[in-house]
């Protein structure tokens, strides 16, 4: 008797898994569009009995895929916003935006120039202060020399008269108001920060030592309780008497 299908003479037996792989989800044309992972025929699920069925791995891959999608969307949105800020100004207001931008740039340049000028003025003031201090020092030394010479000449004539007070050149305006230079200010600030850091370091080391000591005591206590509770009876059962003693000790400690 002839077979029911004439074309099925020379073909081998149809296997269920291969048939399903070819024609499931829209047929051959659908499967040809996307790549499919090769899975052995005897493997029903991903993973193994020892490692599990791969649920955690699938979940991780899904989360990673979603995260990458979000990153792509965020990147695309940022690029679009940049293009919009640069190019898509309204035509009737574009000149206003450009003028505002130029004004802001000019203000920034003026601020930079002022900052540079302020630094130069500070340096000039420091140089003038140094020069004034040097001049004051030289003038005071010259006056001291002249005073000593005049005292030596007048001393034999007026030996019984009391010595006159010193001149008031020491209480001048420049000596009363000596500005601290920026270098001295920075040095004082550096010393203060250094002391603060040393104090904080000492506090951190002290806290660390206290923490380590507390952890050590806690571990010793835990080991002692474990050594006490791991004892068993002759039959291999846990010793309830020791557990009751431990509970009593805890209750007494709480009452204290």
Curated annotation (Swiss-Prot):
InterPro entries associated with the record: Fyv7/TAP26 (IPR013730)
One Pfam family per UniProt: rRNA_processing
Extent of Basic and acidic residues compositional bias: 89-104
Biased composition, class Polar residues, residue ranges: 136-185
Annotated region described as Disordered, given as residue ranges: 1-35, 72-190
Annotated family: Belongs to the TAP26 family.
PANTHER family: THYROID TRANSCRIPTION FACTOR 1-ASSOCIATED PROTEIN 26
Protein name, UniProt field: Thyroid transcription factor 1-associated protein 26 homolog
Gene name tied to this protein: ccdc59
